[in-house]
Amino acid sequence: MDTLTRFLPEHLQQNQLPEALGGVLLSVVSACTEINAKVRLGALAGVLGMTGTGNIQGEDQKKLDVIANNIMIDTLKANPAVAGLASEEEDTFVSAGENGRYLVLFDPLDGSSNIDVNISVGTIFSILEKPEGALATESFLQTGRQQLAAGYVLYGPQTQLVFTFGHGVYMFTLNAENEFVLTKEKPKVPESTKEFAINMSNRRHWLPPVQQYIDELLAGETGTRGKNYNMRWVASMVAEIHRILMRGGVFMYPQDKRDPAKPGKLRLMYEANPMSLILEQAGASASNAYQAMLDIQPENLHQRVAVFMGSSEEVDYLNRLHSK
C-alpha cells in the first residue's frame, strides 16, 4: 500500500499540480501528526479541560484548542510557500512567508467540546491561492470553488487523513510507524440514504421547512417519504462527515430563530467550505438551503452559515422545501 510520501508526488504530477502545493499539504499533515500525539495522551499530558479564555467566536476555549492552534500556526509559518493563515481561534489572519503563494484556513480542533469524554475530534483545513498584492483579509475571502485543496484529519479509533485536490477524495490511515498509508481511493456517497444527523433539541427554534423535513423523516414508512430513517448525532462535524463519506447520510446544522443576526452556527471558511468540496468530489451535495455552499461569496473571515450536506437526494429535497 502507498504511503502519503510515495503517493503525493505521483498524484501531483498526474494532475499537473505544483510541488509546492503538495508541500503545504505535508506541512498540515506534520502539524496534525503532532496534534494527534497530544490528543492521544489526553489527561496523561494534562491537556484536557478549559483555558478560562474565549475565542473570537465567543466560545470557551479548551486547552487542546489552543495547543492545536499553536501547532498549526508554527508548522505552517515554517513553510515559505505559505503566505498567510486564518484560524477559527484567531481574531484576524496571521501573516507568514513574504513570498508565499498559498493561504491556509483551518479549524484546529473541530468537536473539541467532546475531547474530555473521549469522542472523535479532528482538524479541518482549506488551501487557497494568494491573490496578487499585499496580504489582507480580502485575500482570504474567496468562494469555496476557488479552493485548491481541502481536507481533514480525524482523531478517532484510527487516525485518518482525508483530502482532495479537486481530483477525487483520498483516505489515509496512520500506522504504528507514524506514516499515513492509503486505505481508500475516490469514495462515492450514495445518492439516497436512511440516516440523518441533526441536534433535535433545537427543534423549537428551527424554521418551518426544517421542522417539516424532520417530521417527514420521523413519520417513517407510513409517511410521505415511504421509508424508515435512523438518526445519528455525535456533535463533532468531522465524525459526522466521515460517516457520511463512508456510507451516506445527511448532516444538518440549520439556521434557527434565536439570533436572526446569525444565519447558522458553523463557519463557512473553516468548516463548511472544505467539507463541501470533499463531499462534492465524492458525489454528494452541500448547500445553505438556498444556494450551493461552494458558490457563497464570503463577507468576513468568521462568517457563519446554515449547513445541509450529504446524500444528494436529501439535500436537493431540503433545497426545494426552502424555496416554497
Swiss-Prot record:
Q: What is this enzyme's class at the first EC digit?
A: hydrolase
Reaction equation(s) it catalyzes: beta-D-fructose 1,6-bisphosphate + H2O = beta-D-fructose 6-phosphate + phosphate
Q: Name one Pfam family in it.
A: FBPase
Report residues binding substrate: D110, G111, S112, S113, N199, K265
Q: Does the keyword Nucleotidyltransferase apply?
A: no
Instruction: List the subcellular locations.
Output: Cytoplasm
Which residues are recorded as binding Mg(2+) 1?
Answer: E88, D107, L109
Identify the residues that bind Mg(2+) 2.
D107, D110, E271
EC numbers listed for it are 3.1.3.11
GO biological process per UniProt: fructose 1,6-bisphosphate metabolic process; fructose 6-phosphate metabolic process; fructose metabolic process; gluconeogenesis; sucrose biosynthetic process
Cite the GO molecular-function annotations of the record: fructose 1,6-bisphosphate 1-phosphatase activity; magnesium ion binding
Q: What are the required cofactors?
A: Mg(2+)
**What is one term from the GO cellular component aspect held by the record?**
cytosol
CDD domains assigned to the protein according to its UniProt record, in alphabetical order = FBPase
Q: What UniProt keywords apply to this chain's record, in alphabetical order?
A: Carbohydrate metabolism, Cytoplasm, Hydrolase, Magnesium, Metal-binding
How many and how are cofactors bound here?
Answer: Binds 2 magnesium ions per subunit.
Instruction: Name residues in a coiled coil.
Output: none
Q: PANTHER family, per this entry?
A: FRUCTOSE-1,6-BISPHOSPHATASE-RELATED (PTHR11556), SEDOHEPTULOSE-1,7-BISPHOSPHATASE, CHLOROPLASTIC (PTHR11556:SF35)
Family the entry assigns = Belongs to the FBPase class 1 family.
* Quaternary organization: Homotetramer.
Show the NCBIfam families listed in the entry. PRK09293.1-3, PRK09293.1-4
The protein, known as = Fructose-1,6-bisphosphatase class 1
Lineage, opening ranks: Bacteria, Pseudomonadati, Pseudomonadota, Betaproteobacteria, Neisseriales
Corresponding gene?
fbp
